[in-house]
């Protein structure tokens, strides 16, 4: 069985997220996809948007297929959300499964700074998506470094959609062509 973890703050989710998840699903062909909004990420401040609302917004990802589930595990967990803890939980929940985890290219380049990163590499295959056009050389160098440390890395080709949740929240840029079409009733 293949399980794909797609984590993020998702505050709010947007078409760029949908695009990246679609590409990762095409590359991996997973049996189950776990969309997991972060509780309190270690590299960011806690989201001002309540976890319950972000979970509800993430229901839109289910449009990509019946294998997509939204997990509240990190939102419900006390304290900071470390990827190591999440992946360890998934190993227990899906014993024997091949675990895949999507990350953006910016995260690949700093992955060796993550909490217990070597152990994460031993548990998952990283599915990397580029966020910037033309960052191929830097990505290949970062991937090679992690592969030398025992990591398994694959790239999911997706058109780059320049869109950021922070800009949507701030209202500084109009992303109406990249926001999701479904309105959420809460």
PLM features: residue spans?
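N-terminal Rossmann-like or analogous alpha/beta NTP/dinucleotide-binding catalytic cores
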Residues: 39-123
